[in-house]
Amino acid sequence: MSKTGTKITFYEDKNFQGRRYDCDCDCSDFHTYLSRCNSIRVEGGTWAVYERPDFAGYMYILPQGDYPEYQRWMGLNDRLSSCRALHLSSGGQYKIQIFEKGDFNGQMYETTEDCPSIMEQFHMREIHSCKVLDGAWIFYELPNYRGRQYLLDKKEYRKPVDWGAVSPAVQSFRRIVES
């Protein structure tokens, strides 16, 4: 475990079997150590893991816990190549403003809570811009915290490309809470 208390272990096979790769800091390319990744154990911290090297491709946020198969972290396949430890603020404050149009236009909603469905909670189809006022958040392209994930830190996002998306298809979001 690192000085910051972060550690993640990747396993080639399901249920923590086969070759493994231990990591306690950011790693831009570990696919040379493992040909595939079918299970993960996060022993400290919250991690962002990426499908491709250099923190690219699909991203998954993993808090401390066991993930015996890639479906448990909503993975699309057994390919992971890079990871980074998230350094979350310990203040415990969370606040986000979401907007129905780009550049902070249109109807605005502010919340401090997770949202499993923006359609049900805010009667919005998509999020075109947002302001993260406190905490770190994850946007999901589908309801109930499913689909592609986007990590949002404390700052303003004028359009979907600012948070790494190609479209405003965000259907749910949640706070990243350190366990």
UniProtKB/Swiss-Prot annotation:
Annotated region (N-terminal arm), positions in chain: 2-5
Residue numbers spanned by region Connecting peptide: 88-93
Keywords assigned: Acetylation, Eye lens protein, Repeat
InterPro entries: Beta/Gamma-Crystallin (IPR050252), Beta/gamma_crystallin (IPR001064), G_crystallin-like (IPR011024)
Positions carrying N-acetylserine: 2
Domain Beta/gamma crystallin 'Greek key' residues, every copy: 6-44, 45-87, 94-134, 135-177
GO MF entries: structural constituent of eye lens
Matching Pfam families: Crystall (PF00030)
Gene Ontology biological-process annotations: lens development in camera-type eye; visual perception
Superkingdom assignment: Eukaryota
Keyword Metal-binding appears in the UniProt entry: no
PANTHER family the UniProt entry points to: BETA/GAMMA CRYSTALLIN, GAMMA-CRYSTALLIN S
Subunit note: Monomer.
Family as reported in the entry's similarity comment: Belongs to the beta/gamma-crystallin family.
Function field: Crystallins are the dominant structural components of the vertebrate eye lens.
Entry remark concerning the domains of this protein: Has a two-domain beta-structure, folded into four very similar Greek key motifs.
Protein name as it appears in the record: Gamma-crystallin S
